[in-house]
């Protein structure tokens, strides 16, 4: 899996998972599952466009987390990204928000996001 850590003007883009998805209602950084043979960066560009309707430029890998859940074990690669085109909006998610790093802890994220959230908060 790949997730986009998109920062703009000191805020990060987060998306709330749909009610019919695993971990429904939790917040996450936009992204998703990689298809067979797909590069992580290509996966991330595709998933962000499907989920929030924006095109991103994928930068450096900033964190990775392997986390077991009741429905699956996930291996998420978090990439620093920047918006290249489009204004994010909820397409494949319930809602999107721009929040400061210090505010991320106030949102309910899946456990796999804990280390990247701590890293962002420490850097702010």
PLM regions and their residue ranges:
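Charged phosphate-binding loop/patch that engages nucleotide di/tri-phosphates or the phosphate backbone
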Residues: 112-124
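Conserved N-terminal beta-strand and adjoining loop/helix that marks the start
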Residues: 1-12, 33
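C-terminal lobe/hinge of AMP-binding adenylation domains
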Residues: 17-18
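Conserved beta-strand segments that form the floor/walls of ligand-binding pockets within enzyme
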Residues: 13, 28, 78
